[in-house]
Amino acid sequence: MSLLDWFANRRKTEPVVHDYQEREIADGLWTKCESCDALTYTKDLQANLMVCLQCGHHLRIYSDERIRQLIDPGTWQFLDEAVSPTDPLGFRDRKSYSDRLKETQANTGLSDAVRTGVGLLEGQPVALGVMDFRFMGGSMGSVVGEKLTRLIEKGTEQRSPVIIVCASGGARMQEGMLSLMQMAKISGALERHREAGLLYLPILTHPTTGGVTASFAMLGDLIIAEPKALIGFAGRRVIEQTLREKLPDDFQTAEYLQAHGFVDTIVPRTQLKKTLAQLIRLHQPQSPEMKLPLLESSSPATAPL
């Protein structure tokens, strides 16, 4: 038996004894980045608003966290939390729509896929809607349409800016035409808001697709997106099969849409609140007291013909 064989045989027959005691790591203590696989202490990640400290990837967050990040502490008031969906079509796939709703509500603690309310953003009143992808992929049904319409009307009534954080797979198929109607319903409320001379800012997060993209997500005075967010209408595979050609690797990303004029600006999550506050201040109507000073000139007020 060679020395190499002896060591190999010893390795098989004798267990390796470690001189340290394995420690159990508590669940949730560390978080793995979906993009670069880096492990980050969860508290550090939360302090950076769930943006990877290594590669800048924006991890998915949900409505409660989004509201905490954008609204000043102690100023948030929910609107229409009791509004809940029904099953007008008696829809059934693998299970009934009613059962699916009950199960999702129990798992998420949400009544539907959007939460709305009013609060202060750096001291400025705003009407805010936040879509939550946990609830059936953030799909837009009649309750989402109703809550967002009421939110916009509240903003118009109070003459405050409206901000909607979009995260959705599109219209909810279980509600059929009733879900598609919400596209026009929300768009109509936004048009009345615009006619009143008021600001609307949609924030497109990962993912924003389908009927949401085809309606209120693209109707803002300024369209904002988070970095690398998937934004589109139909899915990539559907488009490739229809066109019979390969699409660019960055197709339907926030960066691709900005390069082609569909998105105005891409704002990292860590700068979002500050950017929104600046935009709101810039769009505030000028008060009568804030008249611009007249430029002094030695030339006569009227020039001879």
From Swiss-Prot:
Chief site of localization: cytoplasm
GO biological process: fatty acid biosynthetic process; malonyl-CoA biosynthetic process
Pathway, per record: Lipid metabolism; malonyl-CoA biosynthesis; malonyl-CoA from acetyl-CoA: step 1/1
GO molecular function, one term: acetyl-CoA carboxylase activity
Entry note: cofactor: Binds 1 zinc ion per subunit.
Zinc finger region(s), C4-type: 33-55
Gene3D superfamilies according to UniProt: 2-enoyl-CoA Hydratase, Chain A, domain 1
Cellular component, GO annotation: acetyl-CoA carboxylase complex
Enzyme class, broadest EC rank: transferase
Required cofactor names: Zn(2+)
Role this protein plays: Component of the acetyl coenzyme A carboxylase (ACC) complex. Biotin carboxylase (BC) catalyzes the carboxylation of biotin on its carrier protein (BCCP) and then the CO(2) group is transferred by the transcarboxylase to acetyl-CoA to form malonyl-CoA.
PANTHER family named among the record's database cross-references: ACETYL-COENZYME A CARBOXYLASE CARBOXYL TRANSFERASE SUBUNIT BETA, CHLOROPLASTIC (PTHR42995:SF5)
Subunit structure: Acetyl-CoA carboxylase is a heterohexamer composed of biotin carboxyl carrier protein (AccB), biotin carboxylase (AccC) and two subunits each of ACCase subunit alpha (AccA) and ACCase subunit beta (AccD).
Name this protein carries in UniProt: Acetyl-coenzyme A carboxylase carboxyl transferase subunit beta
Organism per entry: Synechococcus elongatus (strain ATCC 33912 / PCC 7942 / FACHB-805) (Anacystis nidulans R2)
Gene giving rise to this polypeptide: accD
